[in-house]
Amino acid sequence: MPPTALPPLRPPAQPYDSYSSSLSPSSPRFHPASAPHGRRAPSPSRLESLLDAPHAPARSPSRKIRSALSRHIRPHLTPRTLTPLLLWTLALWLVHHFLFPFSSPLAALSRPKAEQHFLSTTFPPPPQRLGDDRLDSVDPRWRAFHPLPPPEPPFPRLRPTRFLPPQCLEQWFADGETLCGAKEMGEEETLDATWLWVNGSDHRWRDSMAEWREKENVNSPERHFREQNELVHSMRSVLDALPGHLRTFHLILADYPFNYPEDLDLVPPSIIPDLEVAASKGGQGRRHPRELARAPASVSNLTERLTPESISPSLARHLQSEWRILQTPTWLDFSRRDPSDPSHPFHPYSVSKAGEMRQHYAEASYPTLRYASHWEVFHIPSVDRDGREELMGEREWRENEWKKKALPSFNSMAIESRIGWLPGLADAIIALNDDFFLLRPHAVSDFHSPLYGSVIRFEHSYNQQVKPDVEKNHINDPGEMGGLYHANALLSRRFPHRLRPYFAHVPKVITRGLHHEASLMFQEALTLSSTRKFREMKIGEGDVQMQWLLTSLRVERWREALLWTWVVANMGTLSGSHDRWDSDTRSAIKHLFGFTEDDDDVVKIEVHRGERWTLEPGRMQKVFHQAGWEAPKATEFLFSSMDGIMPPLLRSGEDPSQNDRCIIDLNRCFGVFWTRQEDVLSADMMKRLTFQYPECGDCMIMALVTASGTLGLNAFFPPKETTITAPELGPGDAYPKYLPPPHLPLTPTWHEADYSLSNILSTTALPGEQVDIRQYCMRLLSRYLYLDAKSVSHFHMMKSAEHAKRVFKMIQDNPKVSILGMNDDIESDYDEVKRLMNEWFEMRWPRKAVWERDWDPVKDRYHD
């Protein structure tokens, strides 16, 4: 039985162009009679003769009409006739607004839409730092900088994923293919890339680590922090593999307090006048960095070495309290990080000034390089899971106290858990270690696309799966096992308690939106684990392997959203009640499984996986070509979320065909709804199928995917034009300034989650809005799309010089290897291994990045 649907709203009339004039046919003030078509305008002499001619005695038709109206209507415009008319209008208004309110077509057209309250899918760029941040560092080892302020509260604000246009979204999710082309789909995504880096030979860093090791009574391996010059070549490899498809590179770097006066030498003398103004006015005298060139020279000689006597006491206090010192790679020239700067070699101004006629596409779309210190990314949410903002004083006090415990950090897992707070980060990100390298050309779609989602590279060995419980002997594990177990324990409290696959040692694809969801969902555990300065500390339940948590969270959120779409949004709205399963739902389930009148005694149903064409050879390439996007180049795809959920991993020797069938026990899966024919709340059935009896939910997904045919997921969705009215504002609630995108509860456990439509729409739709629930579900699912894939990748633990030679020969002899990971586990021949590594790096990626100090404007340019 189809659900009741409100009639669709008519599209609003197109407003006229406010810039049109009476001479434009599109203008409401245009008079055709004033400019007869095809008649030439009279000459000036003709105009003069017309003006001088006597007026014609005949009256115009319009004047006759006005005269007749005045003669017949004016006698009736008296108080005796107007008063009843006004009273009748007032009475109608009172009845309409207070007694029997009814919807008006004009009101419906002017009603605000949720889309008008969504934030942009693009995260805003960060503000400029105080001082000229485009200057190079005075000392290549360290950089004096003014940290960016914390994100504006409330933070994090969930932003929508890049949705396909509505007509493309409907075709894609319902039919598994789309007629939309490049014009409708828009430009291809670009990617951001992130790296963590530390120089373990820096004496300031070593002294700090030694001090905190003694305080915390821990001993961490030195090899975790050794520098082999990997970072610069890892960045070169990404530039070579994805030319023209990268937006921003992000470096996350260690930092220290500003020691005055020792660190005064690290402040560029040219910015002192501007800093004096800022310090004297409490920071209110800031100017844009480009104005520094016009700043007055308030010091005697800006090229001389700064001394405490050459700056004011207020500036000295300002530097001590607000500035910090950044540890930097010595090869990094900070003046060539931003292609939007006219002085950048790849800026169009510089290119034209050099007399070049055309620019290589890789240089025309060259990425920006941003840096962020640990101080700038270590923040905690300023909102709760329901979007309520904390009081300002309480928030600042809490964060400051937490930072005292968390920083400085020597724990890469703690730092990685803050990646989503990077200023100016895009939504789609490749997260790399500095010892990860791309060896072959890649497309953006090898990592992410709006059509198929993020690409995950799982390990498919049953014995490598991650356990779902915290083990006490791994809480202070110097490796990653403790962080993996803790991450799966968190997931198993929120989702089904189960083993989950490990992932390959390759760059990870994460989205900032999902990172923000995790930061809210598991905020207590992540806030505590981030205070573990070393992995060996015994705080809480251990580290959290954030990249693995985000990868597995995507898989679980997709499954949860699929089941919610069918259980709550589809089956729960069949009878128009919007919140329960009833007799109409039972009829729909019987129809799904092909029941007849003689099948009332059926208790169990065997479901078989149907044939699917989503990943058939050539289909994906055709879809990307149609969209005008580049198809994957270096990836083999094993599973698409557009085919449901990933089958579980099997032990060695088990029959793979068992993953192609399952049994639905109707009594066990549906409980009293089936055994006693009782109505139940759809939100309760959601928990039963998704979490209490997860095998029931998994089997229902297989049945619905099969019912959808060879492509698409049409069987999950409610019928077209099914609309649900969002709840009105509650007493004391404020009208939302912005709306988060469609998403399900962010509670840390499933028991406390409320999956009812009214609760979900109360935070993701406008009060009283008529929500197209079918499109809503498709947008919800867009957020969590994924592909399981594999690439030809190698991961090696460097042991000795002889081992390094064998590794490099093996890679050179196999051109199919697309991703390489190399871990420093050197036991002997350290200097020789380091020499071999750097020789091979330079042989493999000789072209320097533009931000390297010894970049050559001739030798290191791109050529067709």
Curated annotation (Swiss-Prot):
InterPro entries: Stealth (IPR047141), Stealth_CR3 (IPR031357), Stealth_CR4 (IPR031356). Residues 103-864 are lumenal. Residues 1-14 have a biased composition (Pro residues). Residues 1-47 are annotated as: Disordered. Its cofactor is Mn(2+). Coiled coil: none annotated. One of its GO terms (cellular component) is Golgi membrane. This is 3-O-alpha-D-mannopyranosyl-alpha-D-mannopyranose xylosylphosphotransferase. It comes from Cryptococcus neoformans var. neoformans serotype D (strain JEC21 / ATCC MYA-565). The lineage of its organism: Eukaryota, Fungi, Dikarya, Basidiomycota, Agaricomycotina. The gene is XPT1.
